[in-house]
C-alpha cells in the first residue's frame, strides 16, 4: 500500500489529515487520488459507504484549487443537507493549512441571506444541495463560470430522488469543459445510463463488488406512531 505522499498529496493536506488520524490511504483513495491529480478525465467511482470517498475526491479537488482566486472553482452536489454539511466540514478540516481557501455549504432550511454573504466574500469550493444552489444562481450570487470540477456525491440517490432536472439546470451554468466526478456506493444500470449523460471521456473505478452494500453497516427500524417519533428517537439516542 502506498503512502499519501506517494499518491502525490501536498504537504499542507498531509499535515491536516495526519492530525485527523489518517495513516494509510484506503483502497478507494489509493485508486482515485493519483488518477484525479494526474488526469483530467471524468470519473464514476463506486465504493461502499464508510470507505473514505469524501477524501478520495476531496483531496484532489482541494489540491487543484487556486486559493489566490476567490471565485468558485469546484462544486460538490449532495442530496441532503446533512451530507452537505458533513462534506463541507471534512473539506475545511483537510484544507486547514491552505491559506486563503474557503469552503461554503449552501442548503435549504437555513438563511439564504447568510449563505449569500458567505459567497460574496469569496469561496473557491461550494458544497450544495441542488435546490438551494439554483436559488442562489437565480439571484446572481452563485456564479459558476470558473468551475473546473463538479462532484456528485451519492449520485444514485440524487438521480433516484428526482434531482435530474435541477442537476441539468446547474450543469448549464458551468463550463462545458469541466470535469465531472460521480461518487456513489451503488448504482443501478438504469441510473448509470442517466449519469453517463453528464460525463465526457470517463473512467469507471470500482472498489469491492459492484453495487454491494457496506459490510459494517447494520440496519434496524422501529415502528412507532407519527406523534411518538420524536420521543422514540430521543430514547434511542439516549
Indicate where each model-derived feature is located.
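Conserved pre-motif I regulatory segment
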Residues: 1-46
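Interdomain coupling/hinge region of P-loop NTPase helicase/AAA+ cores
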Residues: 7, 75, 103-106, 115, ...
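Conserved nucleic-acid-binding Ia/Ib motif block in the N-terminal RecA-like helicase ATPase lobe
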Residues: 11-19, 69-138, 146-149, 192-196, ...
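Residue-level signature of catalytic and energy-coupling elements of molecular machines
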Residues: 17, 29, 45, 61, ...
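Nucleotide phosphate-binding site architecture
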Residues: 23, 62, 66, 84, ...
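Walker A/P-loop NTP-binding motif
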Residues: 33-41, 54-69, 85, 89-95, ...
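Hydrophobic/aromatic position at a conserved helix-loop-beta junction
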Residues: 37-38, 120, 199
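The conserved Walker
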Residues: 47-51
Amino acid at each position: 500500500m502506498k503512502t499519501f505522499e506517494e499518491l502525490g498529496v501536498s504537504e499542507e493536506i498531509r499535515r491536516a489529515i495526519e492530525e485527523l488520524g489518517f495513516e494509510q490511504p484506503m483502497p478507494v483513495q489509493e485508486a482515485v487520488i493519483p488518477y484525479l491529480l494526474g488526469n483530467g478525465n471524468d470519473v464514476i467511482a463506486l465504493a461502499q459507504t464508510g470507505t473514505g470517498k469524501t477524501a478520495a475526491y476531496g483531496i484532489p479537488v482541494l489540491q487543484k484549487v487556486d486559493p489566490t482566486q476567490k471565485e468558485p472553482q469546484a462544486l460538490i452536489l449532495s442530496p441532503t443537507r446533512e451530507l452537505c454539511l458533513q462534506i463541507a466540514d471534512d473539506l475545511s478540516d483537510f484544507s486547514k493549512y491552505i491559506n486563503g481557501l474557503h469552503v461554503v455549504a449552501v442548503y435549504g432550511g437555513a438563511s439564504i441571506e447568510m449563505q449569500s454573504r458567505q459567497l460574496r466574500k469569496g469561496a473557491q469550493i461550494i458544497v450544495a444541495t441542488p435546490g438551494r444552489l439554483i436559488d442562489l444562481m437565480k439571484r446572481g450570487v452563485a456564479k459558476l463560470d470558473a468551475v473546473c470540477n463538479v462532484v456528485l456525491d451519492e449520485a444514485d440517490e440524487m438521480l433516484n430522488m428526482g434531482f435530474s432536472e435541477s442537476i441539468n439546470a446547474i450543469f448549464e451554468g458551468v463550463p462545458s469543459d469541466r470535469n465531472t466526478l460521480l461518487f456513489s456506493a451503488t448504482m443501478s444500470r438504469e441510473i448509470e445510463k442517466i449519469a453517463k449523460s453528464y460525463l465526457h471521456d470517463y473512467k469507471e473505478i470500482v472498489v469491492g463488488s459492484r453495487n454491494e452494500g457496506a459490510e459494517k453497516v447494520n440496519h434496524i427500524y422501529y415502528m412507532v406512531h407519527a406523534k411518538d417519533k420524536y420521543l422514540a428517537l430521543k430514547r434511542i439516542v439516549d
